[in-house]
Amino acid sequence: MPPHSLSALRQQKLRYLFRILDVNNSGRIDADDIQLFVAALAAGRNYPQDSLAFAALKRAYMYIWERLSKQIDLNKDRKVTADEWLAFFDAVVDDENFYRDFIRPIERTMVSLLDVDGDNKIRLVDYRMLARALKLSPDEVEQVFDVMDVNRNGVLAEEEAAAAIQQFFLSDDVDATGNWFFGDYRK
């Protein structure tokens, strides 16, 4: 595989996210992994699996998965390997439509999921729900939230959370707070 034009930092963050999404630790991400991830998110929100809320959550994540996997799954085996994952992000590193077409929908889904009470603010208690799916320890949850809460007001405004997600995927700045959105990417 040719060298990536992605920075070492972005490769590190993307490998970390790949490991998170490979919920069953098969070395590949497939629809089963996404469904397991959704189940963990739903459990964090106390959504019963037969609820409308669970169905909506699953629908949103499966939609993102279907869109991404069509682009990422190079050999069309309905599984995404780490090499395919990195090759995709490497190919779109300079694509100005990538943010609009792929990152923005992820931002909207994540922010709406985390904003439990609909006030356009994400609190530590809200972030803990995501942290359960990310398998973060309670200490990590507080550490990560504190890093992202730049103005130290105890909440992430919708814009702060969206900016953090964007930074996770697009920033080459080692000090960008969004690098931590999904946890300690250095693991």
Regions found by a protein language model. Give the residues of each.
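Plant-biased recognition of short, low-complexity, intrinsically disordered N-terminal tails
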Residues: 1-15
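Generic alpha-helical structural element
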Residues: 3-6, 23, 154
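A generic short alpha-helical patch detector that favors 3-5-residue windows
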Residues: 6-9, 57-60, 99-102
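Acidic (E/D-rich), amphipathic helical modules within compact regulatory domains
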Residues: 20-22, 26-97, 109
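EF-hand and EF-hand-like Ca2+-sensor regions
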Residues: 64-118, 124, 128-187
